[in-house]
Amino acid sequence: MIYGQDFSDRMIELAQEKMPNAKLFQGDFSNGLAEPLLKQKYDAIIATYSLHHLTDSQKVNFLKNLLMLLNEGGCIYIGDVAFKSREALEKCRDTVGEGWDDDEIYFVYDELKLHFPTMQFEQMSDCAGLILLK
C-alpha cells in the first residue's frame, strides 16, 4: 500500500489519478503528518524536495518522529538540496549568487549526522543529495 501527504490539493488529485489505490492526504507536514499516517508502519518513507522548508531543529524532530514509524529494517529516503558540509553549501551559495533562495534551509549532512549517527549521504550533483536514515 502507498500512503502520502502533500500540501497541494492539485498534487493529491494528480497522484490519486496515477495511483488510484493509494491513501493520500492533503496537509502541511510542518504541522505534522495527517493523523491516519501516524497509525501506520512503513518499510520506506520518501521525501523529495520538501523538507528544506523546515528549520534544522524542525528537521531533527520531524525525522525522529518518522523513524518511529518505520518497520524493522525500514529506511527513510530524502532527496533534496543538500550538501556534505557547511563549506560546500557556502561555495554553492557564492556560485549561485542572487539566485540563491534564503528562505529555504538546506540540508548539511555533517551537521545532521550529529543527531543521527547512522545517517548516510550521497552527493548526486553540485547541489543535490540523497540522505538515507535507518
State each model region's role.
Residues M1-P36, Y77-K134:
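Class I (Rossmann-like) S-adenosyl-L-methionine-dependent methyltransferase catalytic domain
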Residues Y42-D43:
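Local beta-strand N-terminus motif with an aromatic residue
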Residues T55-K59, R86:
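Short N-terminal helix/helix-N-cap motif within the alpha/beta-hydrolase-1
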Residues V60-E72:
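A short glycine-rich, Lys/Arg-flanked "PGG" loop and its adjoining helix->strand segment in the class I
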Residues Y49-H53:
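Short catalytic micro-motifs in class I SAM-dependent methyltransferases
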Residues I46:
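A conserved beta-strand element that flanks and buttresses the S-adenosyl-L-methionine
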